[in-house]
Amino acid sequence: MISSRVHSGKSEMKKTYYSTIYKPAEDSFLLADVLKKEIPKLIKVNSNLSLLEIGSGSGIQLQTARKLGIKKQNILSTDININAVKYCKKLGFNCIQSNLFAKIKGKFDLILFNPPYLPENKYDKEKDTTGGKLGSEIINKFLRQARLHLKKEGKILLLTSSLTKNINWQGYEKTKLTSKKIFFEELMVWEVRR
């Protein structure tokens, strides 16, 4: 978890540095819970499982995947936020600054994405939470690009919200793995395959 304590000097810089990174919340914890169930099953079949996380934020999913047995050298992550990239690198992960798959080469067994999924409104225009006017614009762009980076038998674990409208699942099969109602929405984690 990211520290927000402030003591002096360097700690003040840390507060500013970390304050720009999406911090784990209910959505992050729900996806981590799914990883705890899914990764052990996947590793039994493929001990050399490769993982790509788009939008790594604080690195919670990377840390979960590593603890569950995915080899560190088989984990790659991206984030559009350079501070998130630096933080994940400090945690020891291979992380690059990229807008979705723009700087990604290769194919992966497992792709994770906890996207910005809320519809934009006049009160919340944050890049790390809003996914466009309908909330689905970033997700749809991700789904269009992901097929080029997913191995034939690979799968995507994607988090969405009941508030997200018009997700284009064309060309994919999806299965809802879990859901959780919180406040004004329902969060869902989907297993997505080509």
What are these regions (language model features)?
Residues I2-R5, Y17-K37, S56-I70, T78-R194:
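S-adenosylmethionine
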Residues L42-N46, I104-G106:
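Glycine-rich phosphate-binding loop signature in dinucleotide/nucleotide-binding domains
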Residues N46-N48, K72, E153:
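A general structural motif
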Residues N48-G57:
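Conserved class I S-adenosyl-L-methionine
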Residues I75:
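Conserved "HGTGT" condensation-loop signature of ketosynthase/thiolase-family condensing enzymes
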